[in-house]
């Protein structure tokens, strides 16, 4: 299946990567192009842009920082009183590391988690009465990252996800929708599985 993209396409306009996915028109205002929903060669080119961040060697170099932050978070937990593990540990550590990978201020770390939760719950009426309300939150995400994206185009390349996107030929001229789509892909990929793994690991 993975090797036969002509038949098993990942393109969003054909339904994307979800079984039973709904095809979208190219001019759909709420379509968010992202490389996970592209076929080769575009998928391969854009994926390779951010792959260096996640190779084993780089993750090993991040291990001391992760351990230090995890230790500090655990040291700050209340003693002999009930607390919310997900909020105070899982979300906190995940948010800190996401901010590091994007090289954005640590004080904005919970914004990244919030935007991940937003895109995960766009179709849930308990969170948003309409998908459009959720997209207003994502427009704030776009405005936030556009500022960094444009600034890093003008700065020397650095080893962070935004700079990688800003300097590679295949991603340096993305439309606002495509920038938002790929940023959301990276945020959700970093937030959802990591946060759930930390939470599930204590059960």
Residue ranges with predicted function:
Residues 46, 90, 194-198:
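Catalytic-loop motifs flanking and including active-site residues across diverse enzymes
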Residues 41, 82-90, 173-178, 192-193:
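Structural motif
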Residues 162, 179-187, 191-203:
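Cytochrome P450 catalytic-core helices
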Residues 1-86, 95-113, 117-138, 147:
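Active-site substrate-recognition loop segments, prototypically the cytochrome P450 B′-helix/B-C loop
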Residues 60-76, 142-185:
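Helix-hairpin-helix/helix-loop-helix acidic hairpins
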Residues 3-5, 39, 99-108, 153, ...:
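Cytochrome P450
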Residues 87-93, 139-140, 159, 175:
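Short acidic alpha-helix initiation/capping motifs at coil-to-helix transition points
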